[in-house]
Amino acid sequence: MYRWINCYICPPMRKIILIVLMLAAGLSMKAQYPGYVVVADLVKFKTEFAAATQKTVSIKSDFVQEKNLSMLSEKITSKGKFWFKKESQVRMEYSHPYQYLMILNKDKVFVKDGQKENKISTKSNKIFQQINKIMIDCMQGTALNNPDFKTRIFENKNSSLVELVPLAKGMKDLFKTITVIVDKKDYSVTSIEMLELSGDNTIIRFLNKELNADIPDALFTVK
């Protein structure tokens, strides 16, 4: 199974870090984005984004992930299901072309890759502490004020684009930019693009989203 980032972290941690970064609303390969212009009213966007995320207590969706490798013309496509529930509970389950499970419950992480299982505490890893904070900020609507990123916001008729350029060393060593597309109807994330320093990029699209769905706590149990 291909691992997303070829850098300084052990393989399981590489995948977990990318997954958690999806909740940071979890952004840019170009200086400008075709079809987008700089947001007209930044204060209004931040206020409405914060209000919408505060009302969102859970998210359930399908996802499609595309991994584009700079050394290969072929892209790697994966599919699965995603769940989020306040406070700080995430379950991401890959079903195609391989089975992979990640559960994040506050400061505890559980990973199952085939028959291999691994448990990790975010308290023991500074990068993970930073990522965990980003996730919480996003769910609370305060991610746009995170000093660990330089932020720019663009918009078109139907969506907003948030470009995050990492400033903190841990994130700078992993990513050049992270781009999040937000639906203007409900301010939910429709896609995330992560551009690595190597030139590789990962795009994750969220489909069939259900906001404030009834999700049992048992889905996030870390034994």
Predicted feature locations:
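N-terminal leader/targeting segments and the immediate start of mature chains
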Residues: 30-64, 68-73, 218-223
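Short, solvent-exposed helix-to-loop capping segments enriched in aromatics
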Residues: 53, 130-143
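Short hydrophobic/aromatic-rich beta-strand segments that constitute the beta-sheet cores
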Residues: 63, 90-94, 109-112, 162-164, ...
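Gly/Pro-enriched, hydrophobic low-complexity segments
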Residues: 120, 144-223
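Amphipathic hydrophobic-ligand
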Residues: 74-81, 104, 200
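Sec-dependent N-terminal signal peptides
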Residues: 8, 16-25
